[in-house]
């Protein structure tokens, strides 16, 4: 009788363990509204939106749909390159983007505008930016190829 009780208990535990929920994934691609299927980085902003940088702009996902932001020909308030490799958010809610051509941009989600960050604060000049670092205090550092560090 003890063996039967032990066997029933053991099988109950084994079946309960096997009944655990499997991992579930949802696949998002250009068919669901993503601008391009090559995703370089993902960022969750302070509002809970997910941002995806792709080879064709950046995409905001609010949990239901995507909105795409990309370069516009001839616009001064735009990206220099649609291929965005990395994104960072500062405490003010601005997104800092690093494009494939090593240019840094700041995106304001409130106005939905881009601003190219000039080298060392000189309008019209550019630097090859390798890394963007956002400190917890809000200070943003751009580490460049030949122009040192820009704050």
Per-region residue spans from a language model:
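Carboxylate-rich, polar loop motifs that coordinate divalent cations or form catalytic acidic clusters
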Residues: 1-151
